[in-house]
Amino acid sequence: VERYLDALDQEIAGVAKLLGVRKKIAQVHFGGGTPTFLNHSQLRRVVEMIHSCFDVQEDGEWALEANPRVTTNKQLELLYELGFRRISFGVQDLDPAIQKAINRNQTVEQSWRTLETARNLGYKSINMDLIYGLPLQTRQSFRKTLEEVYKMRPDRLAIYSFAYLPGMFKTHKRAIREKDLPSPEEKIAIYLETIRFLAEAGYVMIGMDHYALPTDELALAAKNRTLHRNFMGYTTLHNMAQIGVGVSAISDFGDSYWQNTKEIDQYMNEATEKKLIPRKGMKLDEEDLLRRDLIETLMCHGEISITDFETRYKIEFQDHFSQAWKKLEQFKQEGLVNLSLEKIELTHVG
């Protein structure tokens, strides 16, 4: 771990030097797994790395991902002391049989303990991540999970669709039995039941897969149409460069993306020798920027104004997206979108 932190220190210092004038940071996010794997002195060290190279805004946001199975009360206390105020707990599902099927055993009591500890310490926003479409999951079983989560009353919920890609992921995902997965019809039913349940529970649907209490800033941003989405998820921040550091980290500079190597030994060797080179990258052209804008608008607001895009990008929408328009007409017949010459609007099923 110390060798990895040495490499991380070198990368952060190198990025700061490359950017020139000492930059201000609006948000710091510890993610990519379980940062609480680090001990207290290691966590302090990472935070000190950031402060030594950048100025975090006075109202800057510190957020992290944590695993209730391994996160201790002492860690939560330390992280709060270091400035973290937003925390996201990966729960996935609370049904013991489903947890066993995905090799992630976690009791309801563990989730309760970590959430209540964070709340009592003063964390201002607590999120839970759930996943629908997991093996052995049904509408009834997932509703029970939602009922338990509702009792905990997190500020936000992220409810993601499970993607079964056995060739791309770790051993425990390859071990999942395909026959145990819910059918596409059952998966859609779980999704629609989730929307209904959370609406009745007082949560506002944010974009495609997030929910928040009405007073949460994401809910307010959605209401005011100032919500945005980047590769990290939904945010109230806009036009902010994202600098990713660490193994496999992704950076976004508006019209370009790049990613560090996913090989940890390679990362440590290159970063320590100050020879770290991105392994993937993409520069967006005008067409890419147009399509990204369309996708983000749909994901944030569930609809797009065709006339607005025609004016801003100087295009004839149906001509420019002639192939996609044929698909949209098909989706309209299937009840996935509402379609007119002025607007494209997603339905709940869509």
Task: Mark where each language-model region is.
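C-terminal scaffold of the Radical SAM
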Residues: 1-18, 24-318
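Short amphipathic alpha-helical interaction segments
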Residues: 316-332
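A short, conserved structural fragment
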Residues: 330-342
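Accessory beta->alpha helical hairpin/"wing" motif in late/C-terminal subdomains of nucleic-acid enzymes
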Residues: 340-350
